């Protein structure tokens, strides 16, 4: 399966639904300020960050099970190859605005970019969901 022919709108909707459930289950600042380990970038990882990233990776694993090959790049896990890896990159930030999410300030988002190569200039699909406004933006670039 080609990564770019995947149902990215559906994938993103499922991730948003799972993350909403995670935020609802950890509604207080105390529940959201639990640390667990250190991420790939060297920062301490909030449990809520890890759980939201797990929701993204569950969808990526399902995509790989359908035969897609790509490399996921995340703050917590670093680079993770799926299938044969290759040039395609899926760049994720499961909680952009972790401090706000931790403080239960509804100004944080989910960001996903899918690129045909190693550079952000290679991005062909992008998605951002703002949990405060509960709005998402999905873009596809068509190169000529």
Residue ranges with predicted function:
Residues 85-143:
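DPxDG-like acidic metal-binding loop motif
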Residues 1-92:
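N-terminal subdomain of lithium-sensitive/metallo-dependent phosphomonoesterases centered on the IMPase/IPPase/PAP
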């Amino acid at each position: 399966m080609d990564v770019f022919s995947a149902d990215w709108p559906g994938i993103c909707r499922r991730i948003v639904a799972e993350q909403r459930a995670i935020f609802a289950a950890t509604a207080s600042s105390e529940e959201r300020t639990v640390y667990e380990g250190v991420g790939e970038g060297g920062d301490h990882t909030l449990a809520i960050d890890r759980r939201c990233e797990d929701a993204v990776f569950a969808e990526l694993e399902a995509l790989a099970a359908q035969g897609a090959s790509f490399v996921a790049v995340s703050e917590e896990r670093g680079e993770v190859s799926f299938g044969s890896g290759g040039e395609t990159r899926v760049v994720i930030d499961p909680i952009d605005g972790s401090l706000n999410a931790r403080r239960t300030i509804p100004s944080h988002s989910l960001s996903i970019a899918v690129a045909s190569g190693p550079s952000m200039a290679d991005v062909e699909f992008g998605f951002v969901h703002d949990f405060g406004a509960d709005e998402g933006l999905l873009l596809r670039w068509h190169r000529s």
